Amino acid sequence: HVARRTAGRDVHVCVGPSRDELEVLIDKADVVVDAIFGTGFRGNLRAPFSIWIPAVNECADCVVSIDVPSGLNAETGVVDDDCIRAERTVTMIAPKIGLYSADGPEYAGDLVCGNLYDRLDEGIDDVDHAAEIVEPGDLGDYFAPLPTNIDKYSRGSVLIVAGSAQYP
């Protein structure tokens, strides 16, 4: 199926390469797109993935991962064995918690959230979120300029209680 769709284009399809074959292909590539596993990956790497992932990490100049770097648990951010070290990760629909947790930031590189369809926001607002990303722009109204003569007791205090049943 992939071979038919890429016929006549400068795309090479190689199924099940050895480490040596993969290193030759990586050496010829400007960019390596990592789409080995998806968001459901958990546990330890098995052959041939335990051979390919180190080869990509050692030989590729530029790696872009799709959704999450292969080898990373998308829910926890934990890497059990090895994981693709991406320069950039393009995650779909919404950022995954694992990209921001545990080992995730070390392996994900720059994060880009790609939309899969135009009316994404309408559907995603109806879904219970496990977490929400707070960015600097979200805090502007909370941190209005203060008078120069203010002291620490004039603005109140903060108590944060956080956690969940899923991530105690």
How should each PLM-predicted stretch be described?
Residues H1, L99-P168:
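Small-residue (G/A/S/T)-rich helix-start motifs and N-terminal tracts that mark the onset
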